[in-house]
């Protein structure tokens, strides 16, 4: 976003996104003069009406964090392109194995490689994928990429790098100035993780289907927020964009409140209490007090995060062990 928006610019972003991304857009970037309008991505009119003359990008997640809600990527891409804007999509939860957003109109795709790509929660890293399809000159809005750059002897990145203009600009300018470069060993670990990505994702998806079914039929569960369920508002979008399954990070609301949620979490043995996700190990967290703790009560409610909301990241352990562990948590809440 730092490479797209400068002081005085504006971003349109999906409201239900990772707490860290929300705070980057809502608080950190405002210190640099960049503002963000957060929208209900399911309301296409709201998305389009939020676009201003100084808007530089539309930002989505293929699967929202933590509830795995799904935007209509094709439709929002059409809106962004109508206004000469790039569509930026965080595909961390979707993974390149399950969905390829560029095929649905995305111009830039980002991943937290720490998650599914690395797969083991051992390495911090990120990936930016430039589709090479966006015309940085057409709208006249992206002078930092299209116009001559004085720090590189008047070179225009759009002219010099062609389809790779955006990522070349990031490598030459942003990484130069921030030093955000991973070590060779961390790069090795991430490359090693990609070798087993398909195998791991298949197991994640298989286990998730069974856990969702277990929770949906459990008497101590108030609600399961998973798009594979027929009554989920994004079920049709799930079938469209994720025909091979997905959303192994999702939430459910336990009957009760914060106390019941904490007791459930504290009595799990296989699930690790960690803010990380997309690990081969099953993970659990209480979003309202951790990953999204910087949001106020109204902001939490807008993202459908409550004090009884629990986020699960389903790992690759044997499904019988996973379900037995969850049942032990429910038993503890019952006082057994």
Each model region followed by its residue ranges:
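Conserved small-domain helix->loop->beta segment predominantly found in fold-type I
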Residues: 178-181, 185-187, 192, 196, ...
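Positively charged, small/polar-rich N-terminal and surface patches that mediate targeting and assembly
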Residues: 129, 278-279, 285
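Active-site beta-loop-alpha junctions enriched in small/polar residues
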Residues: 63, 92-94, 229, 255, ...
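Short, glycine-/Ser/Thr-/acidic-enriched flexible segments
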Residues: 133-134, 195, 231, 255-257, ...
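Conserved PLP-enzyme active-site core in the AAT-like
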Residues: 1-218, 225
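PLP-dependent enzyme catalytic core of the Aspartate aminotransferase-like
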Residues: 8, 19, 26-27, 53, ...
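Short glycine-enriched loop/turn motifs at secondary-structure junctions
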Residues: 121, 244-246, 305-308
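Short hydrophobic/aromatic beta-strand micro-patches
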Residues: 129, 251-253, 313-315
């Amino acid at each position: 976003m730092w490479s797209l928006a400068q002081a005085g610019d504006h971003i349109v972003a999906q409201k239900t996104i990772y707490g860290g991304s929300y705070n980057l857009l809502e608080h950190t970037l405002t210190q640099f003069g960049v503002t963000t309008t957060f929208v209900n991505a399911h309301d296409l009119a709201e998305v389009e009406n939020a676009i201003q003359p100084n808007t530089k990008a539309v930002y989505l997640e293929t699967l929202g964090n933590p509830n795995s809600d799904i935007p209509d990527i094709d439709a929002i891409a059409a809106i962004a392109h109508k206004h000469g804007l790039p569509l930026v999509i965080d595909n961390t939860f979707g993974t390149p194995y399950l969905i390829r957003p560029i095929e649905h109109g995305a111009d830039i795709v980002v991943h937290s490689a720490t998650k599914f790509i690395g797969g083991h929660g051992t390495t911090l890293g990120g990936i930016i994928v430039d589709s090479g399809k966006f015309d940085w000159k057409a709208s006249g809005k992206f002078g930092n990429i299209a116009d001559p750059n004085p720090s590189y002897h008047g070179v225009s990145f759009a002219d010099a790098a062609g389809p790779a203009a955006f990522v070349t600009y990031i490598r030459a300018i942003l990484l130069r100035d921030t030093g955000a470069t991973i070590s060779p060993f961390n790069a090795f670990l991430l490359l090693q993780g990609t070798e087993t990505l398909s195998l791991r994702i298949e197991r994640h998806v298989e286990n998730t289907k069974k856990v969702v079914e277990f929770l949906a039929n459990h008497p101590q569960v108030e609600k399961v927020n998973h798009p594979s369920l027929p009554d989920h508002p994004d079920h049709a979008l799930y079938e469209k964009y994720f025909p091979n399954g997905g959303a192994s990070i999702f939430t459910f609301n336990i009957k009760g409140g914060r106390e019941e949620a904490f007791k459930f979490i504290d009595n799990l043995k296989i699930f690790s209490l960690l803010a990380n996700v997309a690990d081969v190990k099953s993970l659990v967290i209480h979003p309202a007090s951790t990953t999204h703790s910087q949001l106020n009560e109204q902001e939490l409610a807008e993202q459908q995060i409550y004090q009884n909301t629990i986020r699960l990241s389903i790992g690759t352990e044997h499904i019988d062990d996973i379900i037995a562990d969850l049942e032990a948590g429910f038993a503890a809440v019952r006082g057994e």
